[in-house]
């Protein structure tokens, strides 16, 4: 069995197109189920399922409040860990930027590497130059503070035995990609990040800053140690602590502390309002 998890907030038009693409690229031998996480959408769910002949089941988890995609994924994984004993999971976004044609390759890799999470790294991004530059800065800053090169997002596939590993320390409530890096073995594959089916990308500078802080926050102890190392290095090289650098390090750590203090605020609350079948 293969369960495809898709968080969605209002973008039902894109989701319908994505489901059609998934159906067209699914093998008839595979038992495919869709788990949609309705992240407290303002728009009423509208699904066109008439031509989805290869998808065996579509289940919608209606959340009781808006959580954002990362926490919506955490809710989905907590739900799935009690469903079946052995199956494969794919997590992807609903906007069309994750290539549904790449799913079969990822599942094949997951079957060969049951103890690993297959993550799809981006070959290229369909954004403007400024966002591409900001994304590179995000990758470099994240690496400098964590010594982890996290160049992938939600798009991933794995055997269900990895669910408990991903959920083991609650860091998934902060950033799914970091939780995967921290708690599991990963195998990388590469695919081009496509254009959104409809509308404009929500990625902007503020989004990337917030995203970076959440990713870094998962590795806070490592960030603290590296921050001290960089301070000592600057002191040794320049025989003094640079005040600007000191303030920057302090602000980064303060923001991270505030961010991680909120990461578990929802984990013990029943966040699934209703379960529907399409």
Regions found by a protein language model. Give the residues of each.
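Cell-envelope/extracellular polymer assembly enzymes that use nucleotide-activated donors
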Residues: 1-3, 33
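Short, well-formed alpha-helical segments that are part of the catalytic scaffolds
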Residues: 11-26, 44
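Short acidic donor-binding loop at the edge of a beta-strand
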Residues: 83-88
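Catalytic donor/gating beta->alpha subdomain of glycosyltransferases that bind UDP-sugars
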Residues: 164-223
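Membrane-embedded multi-pass helical conduit in multi-pass membrane proteins
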Residues: 222-278
């Amino acid at each position: 069995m293969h369960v495809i998890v898709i968080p969605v907030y209002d973008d039902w038009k894109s989701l319908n197109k994505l489901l059609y693409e998934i159906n067209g690229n699914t093998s008839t031998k595979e038992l495919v189920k869709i788990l949609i996480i309705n992240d407290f959408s303002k728009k009423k769910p509208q699904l066109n399922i008439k031509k989805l002949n290869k998808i065996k089941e579509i289940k919608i988890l209606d959340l009781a409040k808006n959580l954002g995609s990362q926490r919506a994924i955490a809710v989905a994984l907590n739900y799935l860990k009690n469903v079946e004993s052995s199956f494969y999971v794919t997590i992807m976004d609903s906007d069309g930027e994750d290539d549904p044609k790449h799913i079969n390759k990822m599942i094949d890799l997951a079957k060969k590497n049951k103890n690993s999470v297959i993550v799809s790294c981006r070959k290229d991004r369909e954004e403007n130059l400024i966002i591409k530059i900001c994304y590179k800065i995000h990758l470099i800053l994240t690496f400098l503070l964590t010594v982890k090169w996290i160049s992938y997002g939600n798009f991933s596939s794995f055997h269900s035995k990895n669910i408990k590993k991903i959920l083991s320390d609650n860091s998934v409530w902060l950033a799914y990609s970091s939780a995967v890096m921290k708690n599991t073995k990963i195998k990388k594959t590469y695919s081009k990040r496509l254009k959104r089916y409809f509308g404009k990308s929500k990625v902007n500078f503020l989004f990337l800053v917030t995203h970076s802080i959440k990713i870094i926050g998962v590795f806070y102890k490592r960030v603290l140690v590296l921050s001290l190392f960089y301070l000592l290095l600057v002191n040794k090289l320049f025989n003094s602590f640079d005040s600007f650098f000191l303030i920057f390090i302090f602000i980064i750590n303060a923001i991270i502390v505030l961010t991680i203090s909120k990461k578990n605020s929802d984990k013990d609350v029943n966040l699934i309002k209703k379960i529907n079948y399409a």
